Amino acid sequence: MILDDEEDILTLYSNFLSSLGHRILSSYVNADSILQDIDIEPPDIYIIDYRLPNNMNGVEVAIEILKKFPSALIIFITGYEMLEKELSKHDIFCDKRIDVLIKPIKLNRIQDSLLSLLSK
């Protein structure tokens, strides 16, 4: 599952990962939508942007995901350079398989992160 507030970024990530043989279950532009569908079919990995519209950010979404699926794999892709420091403030992220990619990134970095998390 991919969560980013920019539809063109969702399309870019989806097309790239699909071209590498990954199946994208769904993509979302806001936190409310992904949380409504959280029980439908848990993905192998979540790709989440930090800055989101409305009232939740990516960390808050990830917390809800980890409450439901403690072993979920999460990649944050963000321009927010202090994200790792923010994650360290929440015990729920301790000993989890999480990666933080700081924008701008090359697309192959997403694939590298995904493969690294899946192999842990």
Residue ranges and their predicted role:
Residues 4, 49-51:
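Active-site residues of response regulator receiver
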Residues 6-26:
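Two-component/phosphorelay signaling modules centered on CheY-like receiver
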Residues 14, 27-45, 53:
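Acidic, metal-coordinating helix/loop segments flanking the phosphotransfer/catalytic sites
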Residues 59-70, 90-91:
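Short amphipathic alpha-helix used as the core "switch/output" element in two-component signaling
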Residues 102-118:
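C-terminal output helix
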